[in-house]
């Protein structure tokens, strides 16, 4: 009998038996490997989780830095804007006594005297041009009467009885006040009306 003709007791050729056994082993191997967890898979999953966490931290850090830079840019712009607005404050404060002197000169000048008219006119023009110049840079005069006393722009010097002005309102200006771009640089010294006793 040749090897091809040899039959096993069940009547199968040896090659068929080997093939059947090989298929059974292949069928069993996936079940065994499914039960066993490869440590490399755990490590890969752990590393992927760490990577995702690191990426999230990095994204959050970048967003925080961007927000901080934007806030810094805004603060810098505001600081520059304030510096531009109020850079003249010291200079204006030095000019205020000159303006006050011109005001006082006009108050005491003898306007009825024809010999003084040229000088009075010169003082008036000088004061007007000086006020026009400072107004261009955001300076406003606080000199209104019969308005409610505002502690932000008025400094009450005295209380005076009055029938003409409502109590608590500004009766008279003793010294003009000034604001620079809405901020008081010198409060007006005023007298305030009160009810007659």
UniProtKB/Swiss-Prot annotation:
GO terms for biological process: protein folding. It is found in: Cytoplasm. GO terms for molecular function: adenyl-nucleotide exchange factor activity; protein homodimerization activity; protein-folding chaperone binding; unfolded protein binding. Transmembrane segments: none annotated. Pfam families: GrpE (PF01025). Residues 1-39 are annotated as: Disordered. InterPro entries: GrpE (IPR000740), GrpE_coiled_coil (IPR013805), GrpE_head (IPR009012). Disulfide bonds: none annotated. Keywords: Chaperone, Cytoplasm, Stress response. GO terms for cellular component: cytosol. Its main location: cytoplasm. PROSITE patterns: GRPE. Participates actively in the response to hyperosmotic and heat shock by preventing the aggregation of stress-denatured proteins, in association with DnaK and GrpE. It is the nucleotide exchange factor for DnaK and may function as a thermosensor. Unfolded proteins bind initially to DnaJ; upon interaction with the DnaJ-bound protein, DnaK hydrolyzes its bound ATP, resulting in the formation of a stable complex. GrpE releases ADP from DnaK; ATP binding to DnaK triggers the release of the substrate protein, thus completing the reaction cycle. HAMAP family: GrpE. Homodimer. Belongs to the GrpE family. This is Protein GrpE. It comes from Escherichia coli O157:H7 (strain EC4115 / EHEC).
